[in-house]
Amino acid sequence: MLAVRRLTRYTFLKRTHPVLYTRRAYKILPSRSTFLRRSLLQTQLHSKMTAHTNIKQHKHCHEDHPIRRSDSAVSIVHLKRAPFKVTVIGSGNWGTTIAKVIAENTELHSHIFEPEVRMWVFDEKIGDENLTDIINTRHQNVKYLPNIDLPHNLVADPDLLHSIKGADILVFNIPHQFLPNIVKQLQGHVAPHVRAISCLKGFELGSKGVQLLSSYVTDELGIQCGALSGANLAPEVAKEHWSETTVAYQLPKDYQGDGKDVDHKILKLLFHRPYFHVNVIDDVAGISIAGALKNVVALACGFVEGMGWGNNASAAIQRLGLGEIIKFGRMFFPESKVETYYQESAGVADLITTCSGGRNVKVATYMAKTGKSALEAEKELLNGQSAQGIITCREVHEWLQTCELTQEFPLFEAVYQIVYNNVRMEDLPEMIEELDIDDE
């Protein structure tokens, strides 16, 4: 009878407390009085936690994927101004995905943001229809993000200046080589109080040397600009598969105050979704550098994948690449923080994701298998989109050459030589090998 009672008690406890009472844990089962006291404390603790945090399933989540979110962040934002109006500049694969995320949040937090989100579209014909009209009637970007339903409060606009009219927050999400032309058109039409976030990956080379794209926006438009970057393949985010990202933003000197201006809490509400978790930090330089240079490393991973060299070679490329990313940041942007590269989604996590798939790996793999050039591969594979590593490796080479430091970054230089000077991919190991043997 004793054995039966113990088994029954174990079975009951396993069902009610499966984590605490495994068969191994049952060997040190607490007494009945201890168990009751512990259960009472757990119940009281749970009641206190639920009193402070209202957790509910989000309406966009599928029933079989019950991601939950906390509304506690909303309660601490008390707006002392009109709701923020948001415009997304760019409507490609990633631009449309971010616009979807933002539009879901502006509708959800309509006391913080104006629900309608404008998305500037470089208009083009899809058959006999304009892409803008298709987005606004069918609520899908059939060219760059097909089969993904977009919120009805997301409005496509082919007129750049009209799309930003009255906007308080601009989100740049275009191929970075087009940024100078876009900024030139915006000059004189953006008020000083406007804030911006750059989702672009790359650098601007000019009279000021190598420059972060967020800094370029600030200098050219006179507005504060942060950055967003992370381990985010657009199709997965668009399908609401769980992922995380990093937003970096520094409060400007003309910050208007809590509840009157964009800050970390506002940005969290703008970008955070149940399927898209956001961490907001100050290190704009760190996440921008990592976001740009990971695409160069991804090209190298694509080369070795296309040659069939396997996972060991890819891992070696990623190790060397991470080292050169950190070195580049410390050398040219000393304000960047080393911990950003390994603590944030925008760092090593983004590097791993990008080197495992995405446009740059796809293009480089195709180059290795077919012998075609980078631009030919990009044109044939990407449906009008860009592999940013192709341009970034040239920008990095030009800057390092100006500084006479190309030998300090052998992986970046090797990628440039393969892409632009037709150096044999098979020579990659010799080009990046670190020799510690002294000549005698």
Curated annotation (Swiss-Prot):
GO cellular component, one term: cytosol
Residue positions binding substrate: K201, R359, N360
SUPFAM superfamilies registered for this protein in UniProt: 6-phosphogluconate dehydrogenase C-terminal domain-like, NAD(P)-binding Rossmann-fold domains
Gene assigned in the entry: GPD2
Positions carrying Phosphoserine: S70, S72, S75
Additional observations: Present with 8966 molecules/cell in log phase SD medium.
Transit peptide: 1-16
Gene3D superfamilies: N-(1-d-carboxylethyl)-l-norvaline Dehydrogenase, domain 2, NAD(P)-binding Rossmann-like Domain
GO molecular function annotations of the record: glycerol-3-phosphate dehydrogenase (NAD+) activity; glycerol-3-phosphate dehydrogenase [NAD(P)+] activity; NAD binding; protein homodimerization activity
Ligand binding (NAD(+)): G90, S91, G92, N93, W94, G95, F122, F178, A234, R359, Q388
Main localization (coarse): cytoplasm
Identification of the protein by name: Glycerol-3-phosphate dehydrogenase [NAD(+)] 2, mitochondrial
Family membership noted in the UniProt record: Belongs to the NAD-dependent glycerol-3-phosphate dehydrogenase family.
Mutant phenotype after disruption: Leads to poor growth under anaerobic conditions. Does not produce detectable glycerol, is highly osmosensitive and fails to grow under anoxic conditions, when GPD1 is also deleted.
Catalytic activity: sn-glycerol 3-phosphate + NAD(+) = dihydroxyacetone phosphate + NADH + H(+)
One biological process term in Gene Ontology: glycerol metabolic process
Keywords on record: Cytoplasm, Mitochondrion, NAD, Oxidoreductase, Phosphoprotein, Transit peptide
Record-listed E.C. numbers: 1.1.1.8
InterPro entries on file: 6-PGluconate_DH-like_C_sf, 6PGD_dom2, G3P_DH_NAD-dep, G3P_DH_NAD-dep_C, G3P_DH_NAD-dep_euk, G3P_DH_NAD-dep_N, NAD(P)-bd_dom_sf
Function noted in UniProt: Catalyzes the production of glycerol under anaerobic growth conditions. Glycerol production serves as a redox sink by consuming the excess cytosolic NADH during anaerobic metabolism.
Taxonomic lineage from the root: Eukaryota, Fungi, Dikarya, Ascomycota, Saccharomycotina
Localization terms from the record: Cytoplasm; Mitochondrion
Signals that turn on the gene: By anaerobic growth conditions and other conditions leading to accumulation of cytosolic NADH.
